[in-house]
Amino acid sequence: MNLENKNKEIPEEFKKLAEDFSKNGFITTSLDNLINWSRAGSLHWMTFGLACCAVEMMQTAMPRYDLERFGAAPRGSPRQSDVMIVAGTLTNKMAPALRKVYDQMPEPRYVISMGSCANGGGYYHYSYSVVRGCDKIVPVDIYVPGCPPSAEALLYGILQLQKKIRNKGSFER
């Protein structure tokens, strides 16, 4: 086995870490990077499924896409979750409940808006009873487009959220 050919496949960041470890016997990093890495790798999400997008959201957790392999596990309580996925049409009557559930989540908390209805009202945009985007009620971190968005689109949105968490300071939001 030729070791030089294998080293060409290793990203530069890992080469630097391996070099530091072989020289010193330990690796130094900032606490902020460690916290962000662990947060991004262990997202606990809860569903706020309001319409047909929730079916696609459930499909993402099934064996074909297996969201848990990316470190995202479902939780039944807002007090145990740090990501809320709002999927579907948000009505004026449901908006206070959404805000109440969001307020029960511990910090840091993130929101993914899934589908055209959650993003901006969608097909029902001009209805008197529909909120024109859940970002009017709670701050949204990631928007997943589509009507309904595919399971792959939601998976991509979660991966983008993990990337956003890794790149952001843990003590500022």
Curated annotation (Swiss-Prot):
InterPro entries listed in its UniProt record: NADH_UbQ_OxRdtase-like_20kDa, NADH_UQ_OxRdtase_20Kd_su
First-listed, main subcellular location of the protein, grouped into a coarse class: membrane
Catalyzed reaction equations: a quinone + NADH + 5 H(+)(in) = a quinol + NAD(+) + 4 H(+)(out)
Assembly and binders: NDH-1 is composed of 14 different subunits. Subunits NuoB, C, D, E, F, and G constitute the peripheral sector of the complex.
Protein name, entry field: NADH-quinone oxidoreductase subunit B
Biological function: NDH-1 shuttles electrons from NADH, via FMN and iron-sulfur (Fe-S) centers, to quinones in the respiratory chain. Couples the redox reaction to proton translocation (for every two electrons transferred, four hydrogen ions are translocated across the cytoplasmic membrane), and thus conserves the redox energy in a proton gradient.
GO biological process, one term: electron transport coupled proton transport
EC number: 7.1.1.-
Family statement: Belongs to the complex I 20 kDa subunit family.
EC class of the enzyme, as a word: translocase
Gene Ontology cellular-component terms listed: plasma membrane; respiratory chain complex I
Gene that produces this protein: nuoB
Cofactor: [4Fe-4S] cluster
Subcellular localization(s) per the UniProt record: Cell inner membrane
Organism: Pelagibacter ubique (strain HTCC1062)
SUPFAM superfamilies given in the database record: HydA/Nqo6-like (SSF56770)
Topology of this chain in the membrane: Peripheral membrane protein
Positions with a binding annotation for [4Fe-4S] cluster: 52-53, 117, 147
